[in-house]
């Protein structure tokens, strides 16, 4: 059954839950004045993840230099300078939360000479100094294709190197006009071929793509050395953002999961609420395909 935009279908109604872990996570993040993509991007899984004591840390502030039409993060051509104490603050938060796996991401900072790569390096090193047994996933921007900036981060050998293609190439002009599909694929290939990293990428669906286009993009990811993939429903953050073209059914997400698994991905998460870092810790522990609960 096809669901066009309008009232959200039942499977997209979030079951809110919170408790001691949720409150503790919020207090800790507020105390250290830390940013998370959970809040900045209005992630639908915030309640669940914080209740499990997990969060995805957002580096380089909360203002992005790109104008992607799907994203709720603030935008400006000249954001405030990064906080030099941010790496230390994040490392302390990882220690306080007793995390075994941490996910780092950042806004895109085209205003900085290296796109913020040195801050990435400083944060990874600060975390490992204070938390030597923590595994790290880095969800990085494209650094405008700057290979030196990419290499700075990749040379730190995070356990997972994540970079999202976000959508199919035919929608790039409409969805993320300042990005380049081929650049994203080359980044993933570089992480695999030059640095031997475990690689991951993600897509949103429901923005006007076809199932055939999704299948082709999954094939492109595999051809460029991508090991893991996440597929989730695009949800419009506000009336100013790109509207949802269609709500993808749970059955369709299962079909995407089955196709991606059969195509050769090591890990697959596919479901309405799946986001790039959703249950990221599970991917460091399991060898089978991971499916998101609906």
Curated annotation (Swiss-Prot):
InterPro entries: Aldolase_TIM, Elp3/MiaA/NifB-like_rSAM, Lipoyl_synth, rSAM
Catalytic activity of the protein: [[Fe-S] cluster scaffold protein carrying a second [4Fe-4S](2+) cluster] + N(6)-octanoyl-L-lysyl-[protein] + 2 oxidized [2Fe-2S]-[ferredoxin] + 2 S-adenosyl-L-methionine + 4 H(+) = [[Fe-S] cluster scaffold protein] + N(6)-[(R)-dihydrolipoyl]-L-lysyl-[protein] + 4 Fe(3+) + 2 hydrogen sulfide + 2 5'-deoxyadenosine + 2 L-methionine + 2 reduced [2Fe-2S]-[ferredoxin]
Localisation: Cytoplasm
SMART domains: Elp3 (SM00729)
Any one GO MF annotation of this record: lipoate synthase activity
Keywords annotated in UniProt: 4Fe-4S, Cytoplasm, Iron, Iron-sulfur, Metal-binding, S-adenosyl-L-methionine, Transferase
Domain Radical SAM core: start-end pairs: 50-266
Sites where the protein binds [4Fe-4S] cluster 2: 64, 68, 71
Alphabetized PANTHER family for the sequence: LIPOYL SYNTHASE (PTHR10949), LIPOYL SYNTHASE, MITOCHONDRIAL (PTHR10949:SF0)
Name of the protein in its database record: Lipoyl synthase
Taxonomic source organism: Pelodictyon phaeoclathratiforme (strain DSM 5477 / BU-1)
Gene for this chain: lipA
């Amino acid at each position: 059954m096809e669901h066009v935009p309008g009232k959200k279908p039942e499977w997209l109604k979030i079951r809110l839950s919170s408790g001691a872990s949720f409150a503790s996570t919020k207090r800790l993040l507020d105390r250290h004045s830390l940013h998370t993509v959970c809040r900045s991007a209005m992630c639908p899984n915030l309640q669940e993840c914080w209740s499990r004591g997990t969060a995805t840390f957002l580096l380089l502030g909360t203002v992005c230099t790109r104008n992607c039409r799907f994203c709720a993060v603030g935008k400006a051509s000249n954001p405030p300078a990064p906080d030099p104490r941010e790496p230390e603050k994040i490392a302390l938060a990882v220690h306080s939360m007793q995390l075994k796996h941490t996910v780092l991401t950042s806004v895109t900072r085209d205003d900085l000479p290296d796109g913020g790569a040195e801050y990435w390096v400083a944060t990874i090193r600060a975390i490992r100094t204070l938390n030597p047994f923590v595994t790290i996933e880095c969800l990085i921007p494209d650094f405008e294709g700057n290979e030196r900036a990419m290499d700075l981060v990749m040379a730190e050998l995070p356990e997972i190197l994540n970079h999202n293609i976000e959508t199919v190439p035919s929608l790039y002009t409409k969805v993320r006009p300042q990005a380049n599909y081929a650049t994203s694929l080359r980044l993933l290939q570089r992480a695999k071929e030059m640095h031997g990293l475990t690689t991951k990428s993600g897509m949103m669906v429901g923005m006007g793509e076809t199932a055939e286009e999704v299948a082709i993009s999954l094939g492109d990811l595999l051809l460029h050395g991508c090991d893991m993939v996440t597929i989730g429903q695009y949800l419009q953050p506000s009336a100013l953002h790109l509207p949802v073209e269609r709500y993808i059914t749970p059955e369709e997400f299962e079909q995407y999961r089955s196709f991606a698994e059969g195509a050769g991905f090591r890990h697959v998460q596919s479901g309405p609420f799946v986001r790039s870092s959703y249950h990221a810790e599970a991917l460091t522990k399991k060898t089978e395909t991971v499916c998101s609960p609906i």
